[in-house]
């Protein structure tokens, strides 16, 4: 598969997951050892959430924190079970996140990010929803080895 056009080429190095069905897609990359980039389109299913959890197992076992960038600009909807699974995944790996960044154009996806963000904020995981421009700026800074 080709790298998503929504992301800079250097963010799509080292693909660790590529799931597709008739309703959507989920791609995941680790362009640097401590950076996880996801790109979701269409509908986020529980099967996609299960794939996410499996694909990131080794990454979460490392003794280091990870910056997560979720490009969900083309994601239109999600199953509530997928949101629950990914929220539980974040909670179970809460010491592994340095920052978690999202961009989306969907009100439904933004609502899901807000609900999950409220749940994980209780254990000091910061979830930030950005404009596309700010998301790309932060991703660029992180890929260059600096923090935004």
Protein language model regions, located:
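Amphipathic, Lys/Arg-enriched alpha-helical "gate/interface" segment within cytosolic domains
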Residues: 2-148
């Amino acid at each position: 598969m080709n790298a998503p056009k929504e992301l800079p080429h250097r963010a799509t190095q080292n693909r660790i997951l590529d799931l597709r069905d008739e309703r959507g897609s989920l791609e995941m990359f680790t362009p640097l050892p401590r950076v996880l980039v996801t790109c979701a389109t269409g509908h986020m299913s529980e099967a996609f959430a299960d794939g996410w959890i499996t694909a990131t197992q080794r990454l979460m076992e490392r003794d280091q924190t990870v910056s997560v960038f979720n490009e969900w600009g083309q994601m239109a909807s999600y199953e509530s079970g997928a949101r629950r699974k990914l929220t539980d995944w974040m909670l179970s790996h809460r010491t592994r996140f340095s920052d978690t960044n999202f961009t989306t154009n969907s009100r439904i996806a933004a609502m899901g990010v807000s609900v999950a963000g409220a749940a994980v904020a209780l254990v000091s995981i910061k979830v930030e929803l950005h404009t596309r421009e700010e998301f790309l700026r932060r991703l660029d800074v992180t890929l260059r080895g600096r923090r935004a």
